[in-house]
């Protein structure tokens, strides 16, 4: 079991690697002698308040940022640093003994108010950055926590007015990266006309999660798994994302994109590419992303026959107003909306390793639990001698909540009789690494930007292949006004989804569910 002392030792090693010129490797090093400036566009928004400012504070608190690093917010709202500080406080997780350092962090912050569609605000911003940097050589990071509608104007103004002349410049872009292949390609072409690919960091925060980053180690660092990771041994792969709440007043925003664009086309497909890709030449970011692109190119475009679409209804027995409110009852959603809040899609990979193995992606809102996981289901044991009682082995990678890795297998029940039962080999992080600190996904990713590692960011050709797979079905759903199947708030989703899983070689026995080391009877 890891101790608190060991955890601090690990942190010390990270800090040493970040700052020592003798320990330079891809994505683990920055120049601590050059000033860095981090600019947050959309500083008045929820993402900045709940994620970006807290992440920057945690990195500063743990001495993981180069010194000096300063921060500047930019938005249309007339705000002050003190007002931003007050709005962020509930999300900063400040301990009493950290108060002095917390005040030091905010002393490094500035704020500029301005429009996104004109030069004046950006000229004021650049003047402020030069003052913060004392007009010295400095590296600049620009985080666009903004709606896509202003991306083009903001990036043009950054390029023309705000770029560091002597240092490097990096631009972080939040999804959505377009609505389909055409709009995504238009955005990519626009960005390519302004920046080099190594300056662009398209962020998918799921790529920063502990167990998603662990996928490569699990696959390529264990002979027992790597040798069975193929169609000869694996029956199906189920990648799941479930949320127990609905749109909760954000229906108008969600209705513009839907669950496929919001979760499946990005988060789940990125996980699939890590599960299914071939072994890269090295751990260099481009080698890894090359293999991800190769496997994406092997995937057929989705069709309606491959999918189940759902939309939640209110539950009359719900314990609160949200649970009793259906999706189209949200006042910000049209009464005749066909936008799916649940989707299941079966992807087929046409290559030697995976031919015939269904990759099932499912995601939904207003379901029975919060869960994100990868479930690798192995084939039935040939020549079963246990009267058909043998269940399939499963390797389960739990992304959230409660990071874990466990392997479902058959063993003899303790006792005098010769009965068999399903149990697991369990690596639950909160048990094995009890005192270890697991960074938030944004901490990992923002630190990667400082270090110049693009391993966990989406490259333009990855994006192009992702939209190739999903654009035809998205257009068909919208043009033909495909009606989703209704399901009740708090349920497991449409029953048709379970049937689709069964049709695609996923077997569920219904007798066993993992609870972080405790087994119980439950519905999957």
Curated annotation (Swiss-Prot):
EC number: 1.1.1.49
Pfam family, one: G6PD_C
Keywords of this entry: Carbohydrate metabolism, Cytoplasm, Glucose metabolism, NADP, Oxidoreductase, Phosphoprotein
Molecular function as annotated in GO: glucose-6-phosphate dehydrogenase activity; NADP binding
Residues reported in the UniProt entry to bind NADP(+) 2: 362, 371, 375, 398, 406-408, 426-428, 492, 508, 514
Amino acids binding NADP(+) 1: 42-49, 76, 175
Subcellular location: Cytoplasm, Cytosol
Modification Phosphoserine, positions: 20
Main location: cytoplasm
Protein name: Glucose-6-phosphate 1-dehydrogenase
Effect noted on mutating residue 80 to N: In strain: Z74
GO terms, biological process: glucose 6-phosphate metabolic process; glucose metabolic process; NADP metabolic process; pentose-phosphate shunt, oxidative branch
Catalytic activity: D-glucose 6-phosphate + NADP(+) = 6-phospho-D-glucono-1,5-lactone + NADPH + H(+)
Family: Belongs to the glucose-6-phosphate dehydrogenase family.
PANTHER family registered for this protein in UniProt: GLUCOSE-6-PHOSPHATE 1-DEHYDROGENASE (PTHR23429:SF0), GLUCOSE-6-PHOSPHATE 1-DEHYDROGENASE G6PD (PTHR23429)
Phosphoprotein in keyword set: yes
NADP recorded as keyword: yes
Its biological purpose: Cytosolic glucose-6-phosphate dehydrogenase that catalyzes the first and rate-limiting step of the oxidative branch within the pentose phosphate pathway/shunt, an alternative route to glycolysis for the dissimilation of carbohydrates and a major source of reducing power and metabolic intermediates for fatty acid and nucleic acid biosynthetic processes.
One cellular component term from this protein's GO annotations in UniProt: cytosol
């Amino acid at each position: 079991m890891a101790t608190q002392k060991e955890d601090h030792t690990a942190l010390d090693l990270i800090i040493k690697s970040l700052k020592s010129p003798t320990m330079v490797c891809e994505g683990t090093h920055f120049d601590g002698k050059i000033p860095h400036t981090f600019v947050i566009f959309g500083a008045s928004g929820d993402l900045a308040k709940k994620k970006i400012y807290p992440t920057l504070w945690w990195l500063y608190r743990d001495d993981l940022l180069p010194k000096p690093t300063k921060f500047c917010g930019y938005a249309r709202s007339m705000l002050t640093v003190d007002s931003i500080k007050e709005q962020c406080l509930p999300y900063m997780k400040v301990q009493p003994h950290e108060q002095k350092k917390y005040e030091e962090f905010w002393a490094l912050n500035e704020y500029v108010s301005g429009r996104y569609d004109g030069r004046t605000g950006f000229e004021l911003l650049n003047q402020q950055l030069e003052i913060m940097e004392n007009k010295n050589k400095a590296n600049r990071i620009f985080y666009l926590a903004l709606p896509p509608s202003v991306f083009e104007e903001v990036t043009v103004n950054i390029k023309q007015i705000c770029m560091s002349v002597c240092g490097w410049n990096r631009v972080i872009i939040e999804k959505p990266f377009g609505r389909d292949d055409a709009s995504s390609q238009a955005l990519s072409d626009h960005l390519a006309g302004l920046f080099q690919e190594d300056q662009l960091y398209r962020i998918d925060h799921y790529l920063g999660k502990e167990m998603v980053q662990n996928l490569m180690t699990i696959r390529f660092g264990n002979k027992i798994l790597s040798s069975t990771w193929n169609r000869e041994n694996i029956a199906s792969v189920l990648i799941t994302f479930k949320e127990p709440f609905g749109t909760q007043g954000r229906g108008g925003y969600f209705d513009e994109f839907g669950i496929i664009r919001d979760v499946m086309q990005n988060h789940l497909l990125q996980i699939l590419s890590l599960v299914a890709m071939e072994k890269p030449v090295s751990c260099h970011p481009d080698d890894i992303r090359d293999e991800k692109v190769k496997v994406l190119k092997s995937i057929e475009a989705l069709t309606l026959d491959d999918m189940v679409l759902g939309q939640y209804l209110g539950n009359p027995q719900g314990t609160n107003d949200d649970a009793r409110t259906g999706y189209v009852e949200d006042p910000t959603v049209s009464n005749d909306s066909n936008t799916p809040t649940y989707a299941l899609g079966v992807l087929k990979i046409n290559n030697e390793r995976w031919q015939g193995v269904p990759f099932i992606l499912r995601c939904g809102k207003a379901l029975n639990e919060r869960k994100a996981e990868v479930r690798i289901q192995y084939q039935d044991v040939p020549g079963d001698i246990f009267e058909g009682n043998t269940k399939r082995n499963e390797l389960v990678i739990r992304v959230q909540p409660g990071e874990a890795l466990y392997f479902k297998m058959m063993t003899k029940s303790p006792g005098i009789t010769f009965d068999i039962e399903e149990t697991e080999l369990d690596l639950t992080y909160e048990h094995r690494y009890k005192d270890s600190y697991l960074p938030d996904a944004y901490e990992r990713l923002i630190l990667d930007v400082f270090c110049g590692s693009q391993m966990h960011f989406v490259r333009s050709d990855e994006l192009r292949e992702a939209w190739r797979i999903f654009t035809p079905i998205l257009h068909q759903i919208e043009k033909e006004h495909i009606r989703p199947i209704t399901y009740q708030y708090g349920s497991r989703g449409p029953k048709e989804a379970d049937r689709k899983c069964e049709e695609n070689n996923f077997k569920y026995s219904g007798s066993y569910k993992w609870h972080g080391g405790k087994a119980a009877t439950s519905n999957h």
